[in-house]
Curated annotation (Swiss-Prot):
It comes from Saccharomyces uvarum (strain ATCC 76518 / CBS 7001 / CLIB 283 / NBRC 10550 / MCYC 623 / NCYC 2669 / NRRL Y-11845) (Yeast). It comes from the Eukaryota. Residues 1223-1498 form the Dilute domain. InterPro entries: Dilute_dom, Fungal_Myo2/2A_CBD, IQ_motif_EF-hand-BS, Kinesin_motor_dom_sf, Myosin_head_motor_dom-like, Myosin_N, MYSc_Myo5, P-loop_NTPase. Myosin heavy chain that is required for the cell cycle-regulated transport of various organelles and proteins for their segregation. Functions by binding with its tail domain to receptor proteins on organelles and exerting force with its N-terminal motor domain against actin filaments, thereby transporting its cargo along polarized actin cables. ATP binds at G164, E165, S166, G167, A168, G169, K170, T171. Residues 619-641 are annotated as: Disordered. Homodimer. Interacts with calmodulin (CMD1) and the myosin light chain MLC1 through its IQ repeats. Residues 944-1088 form a coiled coil. Residues 4-57 form the Myosin N-terminal SH3-like domain. Residues 1089-1568 are annotated as: Non alpha-helical, tail domain. The gene is MYO2. One of its GO terms (biological process) is protein transport. This is Myosin-2.
Length: 1568
């Protein structure tokens, strides 16, 4: 062992059993090792030892496992398999609300003393169905599933042994195992939640639970529902592994509980259920009052159990009894017997000095005998007397008071025990009758038996219980050893024999010929046998070698004996052993009971006799088998002896062990965590004692002796490949195809590099086997390697950082030096440049001064010349401009007056013309009113009005054009004004220049200035004149606009007059329009040979058919027209419609058409066959896709054909034929949809949804027409009308039901198809590059991957298919939204349920991948207009967030709860506890895990306190798997504008085509 400083270990503790410690000092003093340990309670202890590797040294602490292993799911995977490690692992898991833990083949179940219904839901059953043990978390259902699959696959019977002390939860565990077998589905139907009702047999099997609990369970100090008997339930299966029945065997019912209960305990539940649940009349009949009035019920004190309603439990028991075939009358007889037992308990026996007396008139006695149907005198007699039978006579003697009390209690116990056995036998008769017995192929047995018991006072019951546990423990040890051996052999590894503690000496002590039981039976058969004499025989016979190794007598007293059991030594008190072992009733009482008038009691006693005879025959057969050479027994040896309780128990135990040994056994050890039954409280010492008692620690010891730790090659390589240089494994990892041999070579390299002692491990065929402690050693190496690697990386990073810092500083110094030198040189050069520059500046300045002087003189001369030339040129330009302006002004003045005159004249002329035209129009209007009925006149009027509108429009256009010209003229004038303004600005500039220059030449330029001012005044006057002219033109423009507006108003008035005229002639115009349409339709029909008309002709067929057919033809679909196909119309029969010519005489007349139609429609057999096989089953779905645009007729052609056929049937009054026809159609459509699968599911399903919707809309349209149109009643009697309404109404309901059914069938199939893809795509696939979650290695997946993979692209393709099919097939948007929303909710539920059950899967990288996958779904929803898509995926979205955020403080958890508001506390706790910490992450602190678990507990407590409110504490989301609401029922039906007679060319429907052909011919003739 290694006890370096910092080593974590365990140290013994009086109160806690073991406490965590850490080595803080390890030194050698005087040849001894001196250790100092710091305990978790801050105490420091010292340990001195000579050898740190001495395993037998009890003073040495035990090594503690690494944190990653401390809460492991399987105790055998612990590196250090020792007592404190096992205890701590169970405690850690329990604190995290995980009540199940594996210990090799054993499942340890720790009682939570709280309701954990979420662990046993149907969802949980389906989660474990078909899963191998170890795939999911430890669970009761994993054991049940393993047993079920082994039975099914290996054809071998199975046994599940459920053991534990009272209050550990055995009964509940056994009950849920039975529920699993009764509820689990076949593997191929686990895709959708189990919805099928359980069979009657399964219900009866489950019904045995409340019956057995009522008659065999009671409240004890340790348990409110303690089983006081052992039970072995065989669930029987046939060849198809279907449950066909069951058998129950019971062991050692605690009979003494009937007559005695310790304080705070109760009698069997059934008595209290009777008191609370029996009707008042029945209670009066049975003479029952209150539980406190009966001695057999009130000894314990409180008769109530908190939280249990005995009346409700009574009803459950009664229902269960009825279910297993016990009639109400028999139940009443049973209740009478139970009531009689209570009255027996109240019998008061009088005590005398030596004897006891009992009157036959004692009230309780009379009531008891009345209910039992027996003689009270004889019954009382044998309570106080006994009879001894000798060879020659019978001796009757009196009993003393104590003996009489024992006799009274004995008969009560005898009756109750017999009743219990009879109930079991009766249940077996029902559940395993001869027919069932013949079909039995295999069974799974569930053994619910008491665990090892030891109290301050241990009696006969504890002895039998511990004897049974000795036998079971022996079988368990042998089974564990056998499995270990089998695995070693299968893996072909070297192994040596493992020593284990064999408890055979203890079993021999109990059951040998001179063992405890034999001596007990011998003493019990003696009339004067007593506990004391039996004790002396035990001492004399057994307290010597070799039995004294397991048997001893106490130091003081002669009333006890001690047996060394496998768990611990137990001292048994001999008082009552003989009496309890005899457990017989006197012959007198037996005769009295046999004379009963209670038929049920008689049947009970007969069953008891039969069982005794069977037992005696079994014993005889065993004797003959064991002594085949002996002579036949003589008369002295044929004495019939009543079997003792001990012998019966021994025999039943032998049979049980024989059964178990012939089956494959599974073990569940139930642990009671505390004595106070407090929820989620853990008592270390109590649990430790149970672990020792139930053999878990012994199992671990056996495992430790061999190779307890087993790793697959894949797991080992993934964990420890870093222990070897990367050059050795990198080549293998980089291979495209990695073989298993490559992985094994990596395994060997790792082991060769790390483990020097080859005996510490063995390499098998599929696994590596390690000795105890090796995993911790490898973990330490791995941790050291990672620590060293981290240190190296940090060292390199720090070196790189400081080197970069040094280089930066060095570079900075060099730069500074360079800059300094440069600065000095530049400063020197700058000084020299300044000297040179000063000299140069002086020379330059002198030259500049001279040049400037000369330049100023030259400039003055040039400026003078320039001014003179400018003035001369300006005068010339002014003269030219004045001339041009004068010409322009004269032109404008000359044209203005004539133009104004012309415009005024034109305006007046237009006004006069308008008035004249209006008057003419008014006259014309009056003329039109009189001629309104003339079609030609109306056309002429319309034509003239159109011309008038055109004329007015042209006038308006000319006005607009003229307005535009005026606008352009205004723009020209504005340009001129702008030029004038520019000229003025130029003059102003010139003026300023003159003012600057005239200072030196003021006198010279005075005259020039005056001249310029005169010119300026003249220019300003011209500008004013131009502005006046512009204002005049703007005024004219406004007048023109006003004139245009008036003309527009006049035009509007004219249009209004025209509208009024059109309104007055609306009726005529409509008529003309309809006539035009009719003409156009007839012309089209003439050219194409086809016509349109209503679906049904209006002519009655009374004369045609020669009978009084009801006038069903009056159903007219006013808006629904039958139109033939357009460009794709196909020939419907040999008489092609195109060949029809209305003007020719060869067309068939109406009578002939109707007669042929009637004949075709009446022969429904041919029509049904053709429609069913040819149309409905032989349909072809049109291609639907992104770029395909389908017309409605291409989609709903089956519905349109059915509508035509149906309409014609109604027209001819063929109601019965239509009913049978439609029944066939409805059945066929539903069958077709039911058979859809694969790639046809989506398009074909949408196709039939569209067609059924079309049919339903037609029927609704027809029904509304019948109910709202009075014309439909014409020609019908009231009865005929009601019959017709009823027919269509029923048809509406049928199509509504069909739509609902096929929608549900289709959607469930979609869910099933989606389930195969969703989990793989959303949960497992890693679509986000660069963030591999790393649960599995890519190169190893090449070897081990064997499942079909799906990605998010497959999911999006799936949804795209639905979208495009629904869009192409004209499905309403609301339906599309409903379908996708339902599927998204389903994806959310199943993926979340898969995630929450995944082990070693949930990591932050997995959260990134999940978030990416879900985001792609969200984006798809937004792209396709589905705004609620995000809400449907909330659980997945929030799970992804949970995996990515911090979870290390209480504040983090509180924030997390706010983020993940859709997740329940139980779901949060489950996800956090399942979170897989990466190597570079810190583990989630245990305090945080406990904090989250406490939140769940508080939530559960609140839900339990709030009555009437259901609280969902389950971890699963229940997927919505139907029934679904039909979204079509929430939207309006489709409108019927046209029913198109389109039959695709590829359809072979001769009769149907002929019907449509004839209907079309009839339409043509009706139109003609």
């Amino acid at each position: 062992m290694s006890f370096e400083v910092g080593t974590r270990c365990w140290y013994p503790h009086k109160e806690l059993g073991w406490i965590g410690a850490e080595v803080i000092k390890n030194e050698v003093k005087d040849g001894k090792y001196h250790l100092e340990l710091s305990l978790e309670d801050d105490e420091v202890v010292s340990v001195d030892t000579e050898d740190l590797n001495d395993d037998k040294n009890q003073s040495l602490p035990l090594l503690r496992n690494p944190p990653i292993l401390e809460a492991t799911e399987d105790l055998t995977s612990l590196s250090y398999l020792n007592e404190p490690a096992v205890l701590h692992a169970i405690k850690q898991r329990y604190s995290q609300l995980n009540i199940y833990t594996y210990s090799g083949i054993v499942l340890i179940a720790t009682n939570p003393f709280d309701r954990v219904d979420q662990l046993y839901t149907q969802d949980m059953i389906q989660a474990y169905a078909g899963k191998r043990r170890g795939e999911l978390e430890p669970h009761l259902f994993a054991i049940a599933e393993e047993a079920y699959r082994l039975m099914k696959n290996d054809k071998q019977n199975q046994t599940i042994v459920v053991s534990g002390e009272s209050g550990a939860g055995k009964t509940v565990s056994a009950k849920y195992i039975m529920r699993y077998f009764a509820s689990v589905e076949e593997e191929n139907s686990t895709t959708i939640q189990h919805q099928v009702e359980m069979s009657e047999t399964e219900q009866r099997i489950l019904a045995t639970n409340p019956i057995m609990e009522a008659f065999g369970n009671a409240k004890t100090t340790r348990n409110d529902n303690s089983s006081r008997f052992g039970k072995y339930l065989e669930i029987l299966f046939d060849k198809e592994t279907s449950i066909i029945g069951a058998r129950i065997r019971t062991y050692l019912l605690e009979r003494s509980r009937l007559v005695y209960q310790p304080p705070i305990e109760r009698n069997y539940h059934i008595f209290y259920q009777l008191m609370a649940g029996l009707p008042a009349q029945t209670k009066e009949e049975l003479h029952l009052t209150d539980a406190s009035d009966y001695f057999y019920m009130n000894q314990g004190g409180d008769t109530k159990i908190a939280g249990i309603d005995d009346a409700e439990e009574y009803q459950t028991t009664v229902d269960a009894l009825t279910l297993v075939g016990i009639t109400t009358a028999t139940q009443h007889q049973i209740f009478k017997i139970l009531a009689a037992l209570l009255h027996i308990g109240n019998i008061e026996i009088k005590k005398t000095r030596n004897d006891a007396s009992l009157s036959a008139d004692e009230p309780s006695l009379k009531l008891a005998c009345e209910l039992l149907g027996i003689d009270s005198y004889n019954f009382a007699k044998w309570i106080t007397k006994k009879q001894i039978v000798t060879r020659s006579e019978k001796i009757v003697s009196n009993l003393n008071f104590n003996q009489a009390m024992v006799a009274k209690d004995s008969v009560a116990k005898f009756i109750y025990s017999a009743l219990f056995d009879w109930l079991v036998e009766n249940i077996n008769t029902v559940l395993c009758n001869p027919d069932v017995d013949d079909q039995i192929n295999s069974f799974i047995g569930v053994l619910d038996i008491y665990g090892f018991e030891h109290f301050e006072k241990n009696s006969f019951e504890q002895f039998c219980i511990n004897y049974a546990n000795e036998k079971l423990q022996q079988e368990f040890n042998q089974h564990v050893f056998k499995l270990e051996q089998e695995e070693y052999v299968a893996e072909e590894i070297e192994w040596s024999f493992i020593e284990f503690n064999d408890n055979q000496p203890c079993i021999d002590l109990i059951e040998n010929k001179l063992g405890i039981l034999s001596l007990l039976d011998e003493e019990s058969r003696l009339p004067a046998g007593s506990d004391e004499s039996w004790t002396q025989k035990l001492y004399q016979t057994l307290d010597k070698s070799p039995t004294n190794e397991v048997f001893s007598k106490p130091r003081f007293g002669q009333t006890k004996f001690i047996v060394s059991h496998y768990a611990l030594d137990v001292a048994y008190d001999v008082e009552g052993f003989i009496e309890k072992n005899r457990d017989t009733v006197s012959d007198g009482h037996l005769e009295v009971l046999k004379a009963s008038t209670n038929e049920t009691l008689i049947n009970i006693l007969e069953g008891l006799e039969n069982a005794a005879k069977k037992l005696e025959e079994t014993k005889k057969a065993e004797l003959e088998q064991n002594n085949p050479g002996n002579k036949k027994p003589g008369p002295a040896r044929t004495v019939n002896r009543k079997p003792t309780l001990g012998s019966m128990f021994k025999q039943s135990l032998i049979e049980l062990m024989s059964t178990i040994n012939s089956t494959n056994v599974h073990y569940i050890r139930c642990i009671k965590p505390n004595a106070d039954k407090e929820a989620w409280q853990f008592d270390n010492l109590m649990v430790l004692s149970q672990l020792r008692a139930c053999g878990v620690l012994e199992t671990i010891r056996i495992s430790c002796a061999g190779f307890p730790s087993r790793w697959t090659f894949e797991e080992f390589v993934l964990r420890y490949y870093i222990l070897i240089p990367h050059e050795e494994w990198d080549l293998i990892f980089q291979k495209k195809e990695t073989t298993e041999d490559d992985i094994i070579s990596v395994v060997k390299m790792i082991l060769d590099a790390t483990v020097k002692d080859k005996t510490k491990y063995q390499i098998g065929n599929t696994k590596i086997f390690f000795k105890a402690g090796m995993l911790a050693y490898l973990e330490k190496l791995r941790s050291n390697k990672m620590h060293n690697s981290i240190v190296t990386i940090q060292k390199k990073i720090r070196a790189k950082y400081y080197r970069n810092q040094y280089l930066k500083i060095s570079q900075a110094i060099k730069i500074w030096q360079s800059n300094t030198r440069g600065f000095i040189i530049r400063h020197r050069v700058y000084h020299e440049m300044k000297v040179h520059s000063a000299t140069l500046i002086q020379a330059t300045y002198r030259g500049y001064a001279i040049r400037k002087n000369v330049f100023n003189v030259l400039i003055t001369i040039i400026n003078l010349q320039t001014r003179i030339r400018e003035e001369l040129k300006r005068k010339q330009l002014k003269r030219e401009h004045e001339y041009n302006a004068a010409v322009t002004i004269q032109s404008k003045v000359r044209t203005f007056e004539p133009r104004s005159t012309f415009l005024n004249t034109k305006r007046d002329t237009v006004v006069v013309q308008s008035l004249i035209r209006r008057r003419a129009a008014q006259g014309r209007l009056r003329q039109l009113k009189s001629d309104a009925k003339s079609v030609h006149h109306l056309k002429e009027v319309s034509y003239k009005l159109e011309n008038k509108v055109i004329e007015l429009t042209q006038n308006l256009a000319s006005k607009v054009k003229e307005n535009k010209e005026m606008t352009e003229r205004i723009k020209e004038l504005q340009v001129q004004v702008e030029e004038s303004a520019k000229l003025q600005e130029t003059l102003e500039n010139m003026k300023k220049e003159h003012l600057v220059n005239i200072d030196n030449q003021k006198n010279k330029d005075m005259e020039l200035q005056k001249t310029i001012e005169d010119n300026l005044q003249s220019t300003e006057q011209n500008l004013k004149n131009a502005q006046l002219e512009l204002e005049e033109m703007v005024k004219q423009h406004n007048e023109l606009k006003e004139e245009s507006r008036k003309q527009l108003d006049e035009l509007d008035e004219t249009k209004k007059a025209l509208v009024e005229h059109q309104t007055l002639n609306g009726d005529l115009q409509n008529e003309v329009k309809s006539l035009k349409e009719e003409i156009s339709r007839l012309q089209t029909a003439m050219s194409l040979g086809t016509v349109t008309t209503s679906v049904l002709p209006q002519t009655p067929l009374k004369d045609v058919m020669g009978g009084s057919t009801a006038n069903y033809n009056s159903l007219m679909l006013d808006n629904a027209e039958l139109s033939p196909g357009k460009s794709r119309t196909t020939p419907m029969s040999g008489n092609h419609i195109d060949s029809l010519n209305i003007d020719q005489d060869n067309g068939a007349n109406a009578t002939q058409i109707n007669e042929e139609l009637y004949r075709l429609l009446e022969d429904t057999e041919i029509l049904n066959q053709e429609i069913t096989e040819g149309l409905l089953k032989g349909f072809e779905v049109p291609d639907a896709g992104v770029a395909i645009q389908l017309s409605k007729r291409d989609v709903v052609y089956p519905a349109r054909i059915l509508i035509i056929v149906l309409s014609e049937m109604w027209r001819f009054g063929l109601t019965k034929q239509s009913e049978s026809f439609l029944a066939q159609v409805l059945t066929t459509i539903q069958k077709v949809v039911t058979q859809l699968k694969g790639n046809d599911l989506i398009p074909s399903g949408v196709f039939w949804l569209a067609n059924v919707r079309e049919l339903y809309s037609f029927v609704v349209f027809a029904l509304n027409s019948i109910l709202t149109e009075e014309t439909f009643k014409n020609g019908m009697t009231d009865e005929e009308y009601k019959e017709y309404v009823s027919l269509v109404t029923e048809l509406k309901d049928d199509f509504e039901a069909l739509s609902y059914n096929i929608y549900n069938i289709w959607l469930k199939k979609l869910q099933k198809q989606l389930q195969k893809k969703a989990i793989n795509a959303v949960v497992i696939s890693e679509s986000l590059p660069g963030f591999s979650a790393g649960e599995t290695s890519g190169f190893l997946n090449k070897i081990f991957a064997n499942t079909e993979e799906y990605t998010m692209d497959d999911i999006l393709t799936f949804f795209n298919s639905i979208y495009w099919c629904m869009k192409s097939f004209h499905i309403e948007t609301e339906v599309f939204h409903a379908v996708v929303t339902t599927l998204l909710n389903y994806v959310d539920a199943i993926c979340f349920n898969e995630l929450i059950m995944k082990r070693n899967f949930l990591s932050w990288k997995r959260g990134l991948q999940l978030n990416y996958n879900v985001t792609r779904l969200e984006e798809w929803c937004k792209t396709h207009g589905l705004t609620g898509g995000t809400e449907c995926l909330q659980h997945l979205i929030q799970t992804a967030k949970l995996l990515q955020v911090r979870k290390y403080t209480i504040e983090d958890i509180d924030i997390l709860r706010g983020i993940c508001y859709s997740l329940t506390p139980a779901q949060l706790q489950k996800l956090i506890s399942q979170y897989q910490v990466a190597d570079y992450e810190s583990p989630i602190p245990q305090e945080i895990l406990r904090y989250v678990a406490d939140i769940v507990k508080k939530e559960a407590a609140l839900s339990n306190d709030s009555k009437g409110h259901e609280h969902s504490s389950g971890i699963f989301i229940t997927p919505e798997t139907g029934p679904f609401t039909d979204p079509f029922s929430l939207i309006k039906t489709r409108k019927f504008d046209q029913v198109e007679a389109y039959i695709p060319a590829w359809l072979s429907l001769p009769a149907t085509k002929r019907i449509v052909d004839l209907v079309a011919q009839q339409v043509v003739q009706d139109g003609h």
